[in-house]
Regions:
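Conserved SAM/SAH-binding beta-strand->alpha-helix loop
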Residues: 115-119
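N-terminal auxiliary segments of SAM/dcSAM-dependent transferases
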Residues: 1-51
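Class I SAM-dependent methyltransferase Rossmann-like catalytic core
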Residues: 50-76
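A short glycine-rich, Lys/Arg-flanked "PGG" loop and its adjoining helix->strand segment in the class I
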Residues: 161-173
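Conserved SAM-binding loop of SAM-dependent methyltransferases across substrates and taxa
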Residues: 95-107
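Conserved class I S-adenosyl-L-methionine
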Residues: 84-94, 173-203
């Protein structure tokens, strides 16, 4: 395991540091966590995990992202990453697509992809040579040391503001990607996809009340998609559970509209005194 990543990981049971031992990670109190043969480490607490993405959903997302449709989003996310960053984590990383872009922008950094979905972590473990993949639940407490991260990514994923602040350095950066109201509007109308919450901005601000907004970009661009790509787009997220299956003459032009925002800890000035 990459040394920088191992030094940042903590036992999810007792919060002690971890060390490698015969293919597993162990803490001084004897808690042991296996590394799956697919490359990720399971740092769950034994509690029932939230329902993660299915194998089909992950395959759809991987195909869609690798086709380059969200390359502009990935580039914008990477643009908020300081080149000097040493450790980057993506919470709700999925396949590791955005983490890989961030690591390319910070040539000396190591990365941690955290997710609850094993099918996603199998891909995230191979997303970048400088990345490790960890199964962990953001709501159970991240298995990371206090103030260990230079950058934390959160792309279309659940947010735990208090935990984000705990694991981020005082001078660190949080980069959050959220959909705007027009995101995938054509598909929402035609296939009954879930609407973007009109109060999303207010809820986001409340969740991240320990952070100050330091930069943001709104992106809106057309996606010209084949019928198979429309099916992949519908099937790669939570809409897969709620929407009708796209038909053979699926819409070929869809609007993507997202906001990429960067935040800094609100108490960073006090920490620097």
């Amino acid at each position: 395991m990459i040394h920088t990543v191992l030094a940042a990981l903590r036992c999810p049971v007792c919060r002690e540091a971890l060390h490698q031992s015969d293919g597993s990670l162990r803490c001084p109190r004897g808690h042991s966590f296996d590394r799956a043969r697919q490359g990720y480490v399971h740092l769950g607490t034994g509690r029932k995990l939230p329902e993660g993405d299915t194998t089909d959903m992950v395959a759809a997302r991987s195909a869609f992202l690798q086709a380059g449709h969200y390359q502009g989003v990935r580039t914008t996310v990477a643009g908020f990453v300081p080149p000097s960053a040493a450790l980057i984590a993506d919470i709700g990383a999925g396949t590791g697509y955005y983490l890989a872009g961030a690591l390319d922008a910070a040539p000396e950094a190591a990365g941690i992809a955290l997710d609850v979905a094993k099918p996603a972590l199998r891909r995230a473990a191979r997303a970048h040579p400088r990345a490790e993949a960890v199964l962990a639940d953001v709501w159970a407490g991240l298995p990371l040391a206090d103030g260990c991260l230079d950058v934390l990514l959160n792309v279309f994923a659940p947010r735990n503001g208090a935990e984000f602040r705990r694991v981020l350095r005082p001078d660190g950066r949080l980069v959050v990607v959220t959909p705007l109201p027009r995101h995938l509007a054509e598909l929402r109308e035609r296939y009954g996809l879930l609407d973007v919450d009109p109060d999303k901005a207010e809820r986001l601000a409340a969740t991240l009340r320990e952070f100050d907004l330091v930069g943001a970009e709104e992106l809106e661009f057309p996606l010209r998609l084949t019928p198979d790509e429309v099916r992949a787009l519908v099937g790669m997220g939570p809409n897969a559970f709620h929407s009708a299956a796209p038909d053979a003459d699926a819409v070929t032009t869809v609007t993507a509209a997202v906001r990429v925002a960067a935040y800094a800890p609100a108490d960073r000035q006090l920490a620097g005194r």
